[in-house]
Amino acid sequence: MPNAPRVILSGFADEAANHKTAVEQFAAFAALGLQYYSIRFIDVGNGIKNVMALSKPEIQRVRELMNEYELNVSSLGSPIGKIKLSDTDDGTHNKYVPFKQYLNRDVKKACELAHAFETKLIRGFSFYHPKSTDPWEFVTEVVDRLGQIAEVCHRSDLTFGLEVEANLVGQTGELLAEIHRQVNHPAMVLIFDAANVICQGYSTAETFAQYRAMRSGLGWIHIKDYLSPKASEKGGHVDEEILKNFVPADQGDAAHEAILRDFARVIPALERKLRRRGIPGVFLDMEPHVKGGGQFGGFSGPDGMGVALRGLCRVLDYVGIDYHLRDFEDVKAARGF
């Protein structure tokens, strides 16, 4: 598509692997034609670990396999920000870590890992407020913490992406947009995820409005969709049972066609902004969960990831957004003769 806005396709590779081994993940993504992936859970021979728990030898092995399969990391799929704001028993299993300790240990570790995997992007979240409380009451506290996280990332020449997700303070587009406005830091951008909104009981129109609220602060987008007659009470707590009804981007209630058609107008300026921070382009990061989702991840299998990719590509083709999947020119370049 000449002169069409272009995105870089990526995805959470752990969703494509039945056993989350590095070879499974990378073989699936290479076969799908993807050249980027977000790293989250991975097994390098010592069991499944979150990226935050990888040892230096494991990191080195992942890097070797990335080179073998010609993959790059789009973002570090960290769980930064998925802890409680306060040490309050609210009936959930969410853990609490004193913030100064969290900043000096976990956030700095995430920055070190981002550099180890040569990515400029760290995915993160907006902290858990006590269950059944009003998230707006905690915006000021979250802004203070996220401002400090953004500054740590900035000093490491990295960018922190804040994802909209249920049960967190930034659970809606309006909340996340206000947090972004108050933090007002060049190293913090927003990540829209339509399914994370619509599974909270919001309508298609309301989901689009939440995307529009976040649009000026966007850094990249996660792609998954949701279709079920049983969503949660609007804006209420989302439990694990609800997280079983995800579908490809061309089949759900989130209207990715409308979202991506609008986003196409934003891509050129956003790409220029991201490149100034050393980021190669605008990522669409697939996290389809088509075989089930959960609080810290989801699963699609190699077949489900393929179905999700083809569904996304159909939408992109329809709205006029360009992308690249590996072709024979890439194969010729890789074979070295």
Question: Can you name each region flagged by the protein language model?
Answer:
Residues 56-78, 143-156, 182-183, 255-263:
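Alpha-helix-loop-beta-strand connector modules within alpha/beta enzyme cores
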Residues 12-14, 28, 32-56, 77:
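N-terminal substrate-binding region of glycoside hydrolase catalytic domains
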Residues 43-56, 80-104, 126-139, 236-247, ...:
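Surface-exposed, active-site-proximal loop segments in enzymatic domains
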